[in-house]
Structure formats: C-alpha cells, structure tokens
C-alpha cells in the first residue's frame, strides 16, 4: 500500500470516528433534553406523551391535598387560563406554597394527570423562570407575570 493511500485511510478513519463521536454526543443530549410547557400548552396537546417534560406556573390557592401517607401530595398548577393536576411523592421544597411559582418535572398520564418526579419552587419573592413569566403574560396575566420576574 502506498503512503498516500495510508494517509487517506487514516483521514477517512479519523473523520468516521469524529462523526460517530458527534452522533453519540448529540444522541445523549437529545435524550436528556427536557422541555418546558404551561398548563395551557398541555391542555392543547402540545406536551409529549411517554416522555419527561417540565410544567410550570402558579400553585392554585386551596388546591394542595396531602395524602394520609404523609409523602404524597396533589396540587393544581395554573397559568390563569388552564390548570393541571400534579401528583408528587416525596419531600417538597421549603418554599413550596399556594399562590407561588412552581416547576414540576415528570410525565403526563393518559387521563391528563401529571406525575412529577421533581418539584422546584421559586427561590425568592422576585424570581420566576423566564418561560413561566412569558407563559403567564401570554395567558392574559401580565400584571402577575410582571410582578414575578
């Protein structure tokens, strides 16, 4: 084999390895990508089925129900236009309260129940994830979204 053919073979093998590595990285990134949806988007059918995603909005006042086991909690997340029932089994953040911002990550069941694996509460009185503030503004609650930037 000539030296020129060896170099060409090494270049082709290197490019193939680089392409394979890039494909593996992109595949792993795609599997770990989690999208954010509002209750209105979930109600409109825009949220994926059988795939984890995040839903965010405000915890509806009077909607928190704690089960007898002391670990399971059910509550409504609203963007003022729609609301979504969320079930969570685990310890809630200290800042989790009615009327406050929340982001839950989990999956949607066939009967429109969101089963959360993780619940995140806003960390101070002035913070709201940009996606949630935008969603509230789009849902017709600009004063609420502006107050919670």
From Swiss-Prot:
TM region(s), chain numbering: 8-28
Residues holding heme: 123, 127
Cellular localization per UniProt: Cell inner membrane
Membrane topology, Periplasmic segments: 29-149
Cited InterPro entries: CcmE, CcmE-like_sf, NA-bd_OB-fold
Membrane topology: Single-pass type II membrane protein
GO biological process, one term: cytochrome complex assembly
Keyword Protein biosynthesis: no
Keywords, in A-Z order: Cell inner membrane, Cell membrane, Cytochrome c-type biogenesis, Heme, Iron, Membrane, Metal-binding, Signal-anchor, Transmembrane, Transmembrane helix
Cytoplasmic topological domain: 1-7
Role this protein plays: Heme chaperone required for the biogenesis of c-type cytochromes. Transiently binds heme delivered by CcmC and transfers the heme to apo-cytochromes in a process facilitated by CcmF and CcmH.
NCBIfam families given in the database record: PRK13254.1-1, PRK13254.1-3, PRK13254.1-5
Protein name in UniProt: Cytochrome c-type biogenesis protein CcmE
Organism: Polaromonas naphthalenivorans (strain CJ2)
Gene behind the chain: ccmE
